[in-house]
Amino acid sequence: MGGVELDMTKKIIGITMGDPASIGPEISAKVLVDKEIYDRCNPLIIGDASTMRKALELIGKEDFQVNAIKDVEDAVFTYGTIDVYDLENADMNLIKPGLVSKEAGEASFQYVDKVIDLALEGKIHATVTNAFNKEAINLAGYNYSGHTEFYAEKTKTEKYTMLLAHENLRVLHVSTHVSLREACDLVKKDRVYDLIVIGEEFCKKIGIENPKIAVAGLNPHSSENGLFGHEEMEEIIPAIQLAKEKGIDVDGPVPPDTIFSKAYGGMYDIVVAMYHDQGHIPLKVLGFVYDKERQVWKEISGVNITLGLPIIRTSVDHGTAFGKAWKGTASELSLKNAIDYAIRLSKK
């Protein structure tokens, strides 16, 4: 790394390539041919160098060099050269674009495992993940419902949460990848309180000095004093009261059908949602733009951030998009958003 120290102004951001059969290699290439990224950070792809070369060819950027390395110290961090921490594990003769496979699952999981190791060892300042496919990693023998759960296990983190962000709308989730029936059972006072605290800490990290937090209800109209359920009275309101006693500026339970409009309009800085779809739907209505004529996603923006970890982890807010894989038409906007947040968080 030419004597560059970890306390340099530009932080080292480790970016996983994602499933080799997905849009991950393409959008990684598209982001790293943008000089602005190199002006703001030192990006390092964790993936397969030969696959990245193919991705550069796909987008017509064969003139860019790929620097395959086995140690972060060997990165050059220079525009025009893409540094790849090369695991040499993606045989594109076996891995077919757009198809689920054990081989792609194995490769993509190894990228995540390695980027976490590099962050824990202090060799990089933040991690950004492209999507892996849950079916593919399970075929490879890794039984995780997503990145978040693996990050938590590997870093030995007990209190963590998924945050989604699009523009000024930021949403935390009490639960994520569980059934709706189970999600209702997971709405507990301690969990809701922990997320309020985590949300306040996150807002302060990104420069919001006095954040205003809103907590969503679980039931329609936040149950109207127990008419439509008891979770608000028994679990959510006690958590909010405890947070207020600790000096946190928090409202709720706010009815779920209006809370996100209020937050997007500027009334709140961050929202605590009770389950996966309650929080994801409003974010994706805003960030995902569908082109009816072309029958494709015109734009995909937003970022997924795991809070509570000892390391920084941001991610694209979409899946592997196998239907668009290796066609040269995938949007890199969400990956740019994720890198932007990683840079901002790594400077705090």
Question: Where are the language model's segments positioned?
Answer:
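Active-site glycine-rich loop that binds ribose-phosphate moieties when present
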Residues: 149-150, 156-158, 180-202
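Contiguous, glycine/small-aliphatic-enriched amphipathic segments in soluble metabolic enzymes
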Residues: 2-147, 193-214, 218-274, 278-303, ...
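Well-ordered beta-strand positions
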Residues: 164, 304-306
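Flexible loop/hinge segments that line or gate small-molecule binding clefts
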Residues: 145-171, 176-179
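Helix-enriched interaction subdomains in cytosolic or periplasmic regions
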Residues: 130, 137-143, 166, 179, ...
